Amino acid sequence: MENENKPNVANFEAAVAAKDYEKACSELLLILSQLDSNFGGIHEIEFEYPAQLQDLEQEKIVYFCTRMATAITTLFSDPVLEISDLGVQRFLVYQRWLALIFASSPFVNADHILQTYNREPNRKNSLEIHLDSSKSSLIKFCILYLPESNVNLNLDVMWNISPELCASLCFALQSPRFVGTSTAFNKRATILQWFPRHLDQLKNLNNIPSAISHDVYMHCSYDTSVNKHDVKRALNHVIRRHIESEYGWKDRDVAHIGYRNNKPVMVVLLEHFHSAHSIYRTHSTSMIAAREHFYLIGLGSPSVDQAGQEVFDEFHLVAGDNMKQKLEFIRSVCESNGAAIFYMPSIGMDMTTIFASNTRLAPIQAIALGHPATTHSDFIEYVIVEDDYVGSEECFSETLLRLPKDALPYVPSALAPEKVDYLLRENPEVVNIGIASTTMKLNPYFLEALKAIRDRAKVKVHFHFALGQSNGITHPYVERFIKSYLGDSATAHPHSPYHQYLRILHNCDMMVNPFPFGNTNGIIDMVTLGLVGVCKTGAEVHEHIDEGLFKRLGLPEWLIANTVDEYVERAVRLAENHQERLELRRYIIENNGLNTLFTGDPRPMGQVFLEKLNAFLKEN
């Protein structure tokens, strides 16, 4: 009995073979849900595999994906299969895992299934699929139209047939944590241009997969277009209409300002905030310092550990079984304490912060750049940011509160090594180039640049990708993508524990940073290991932060590229000139530049907030 509800590949295959399609869909959703919980890991899904694969983890994953893709093909190719309106929403929430099953198998995509839905035998182009007029066919098409699909899709036609189904597909196609290949990347780029004005027409979130709203909100930052964040504005409008019509939401009357211990109150809504997380390391010191002027109340999830809770005068778990209840709880805390400031150190990684950003909870509402991008919210007035991280203020809908560059001093990672034995190779036969990157930061433009570095360098180079989030069924797909550009000149290391990740980078001679979405922690890790590298700067904070950090660390400005051509040229120079590279590394090691990131005056944020509050009180 214990194993009956455990995800099991054989149970899924048996239900498909028996044409028990309701059970087959339930079994499939159970497997997809487990993949989602495990970030793509297959270790809690039961399936038998040949003993020969016992110690071959990647081959075992490809075997799993191939078996799953084969059974899904049989299931979805049968015209008898019907998926309900509710069913399609459940499948689209998990579409990214369906996509990875096919992408990490020899199938690559599910176009061979979509071809079975074609009803026009005399079509001129095999990539044109002519569906019958039933909603059932459109539903199945949407579930299996994946990021790697080569089939043509006219979004305008689909919108005219079913706006909510079209919007749901657009949500699903923006949800993967890896959209790196040119096919997938261009698909998302097209959606980011087309979708905002259409999304804004929806009355509410009722018939779209709102559980992945935060992926739509956050993943747009990894695109390259100037207006890539416009989708947030449309999503914010729909969320606002939804909470007003479905929740009966009323904003807090912010005329009353309360005081605790003779201080105005700042309510802080947290996402990921524990001592091991980067948001804690980058934003805790400034909040502790703000307690000089404000009484700080922290609101967060059970993942906020003791160190995270101790940042605040008091801390509460956000109560509520659903979003309506959570928002009402946050409002009640703000109301009962007469909050003067509502502050979120980060926004975009959790649904609660995004929904809260579309409400009025305090007279002054601000975010910091834990996820470095604008909110495009009508309810957020200010963004806290260090002055040297700003590329262009035009990237923001908010007013920037630009603090001195040492006003948000970092807390060193608890996992950072106490001692590093630096590996300084005088004249390596192969220059090992490290890349610290999550899967989300990989894209075709970055890989083309790496390919150009390899081709132009007069020395042999080898790229080591120390990848975050490349787990389970994600990794074979990511590895194939990297190899498609760099072949044997690259090693794609799957997601690994921090010390193992550092060991990969430790064995490198230099690093290069991803673009357009750069690194913060990756640069700290680089300098910790006595390495130097190249970055590309730009207008967005998530591009410009690399430049700011390089300058703070005392690295020469030639390592900061303004264009892709400069990036390639500087990386080639660093790879070819061993003596110059070693001198830079020794300079970094001897000057301990990291101390500049861990020291500073964290008081300006509290002072600036107090100035804004006093100005508000004077006017009101």
From Swiss-Prot:
The keyword Protein biosynthesis does not apply. GO terms for molecular function: glycosyltransferase activity. It comes from the Bacteria. It is an enzyme of class 2 (transferase). Keywords: Cytoplasm, Glycosyltransferase, Transferase. Its EC number is 2.4.1.-. One of its GO terms (biological process) is protein glycosylation. GO terms for cellular component: cytoplasm. Its main location: cytoplasm. Pathway: Protein modification; protein glycosylation. It catalyses: L-asparaginyl-[protein] + UDP-alpha-D-glucose = N(4)-(beta-D-glucosyl)-L-asparaginyl-[protein] + UDP + H(+). InterPro entries: Glycosyltr_41/O-GlcNAc_trsf (IPR051939), HMW1_D2 (IPR040542), HMW1C_N (IPR041109). It is found in: Cytoplasm. Inverting glycosyltransferase that catalyzes the transfer of one glucose moiety from UDP-glucose to an asparagine residue in peptides and proteins containing the NX(S/T) motif, resulting in their modification with a beta-linked 1,N-glucose. Likely acts as a key component of a general protein glycosylation system. Belongs to the glycosyltransferase 41 family. This is UDP-glucose:protein N-beta-glucosyltransferase. It comes from Actinobacillus pleuropneumoniae serotype 5b (strain L20).
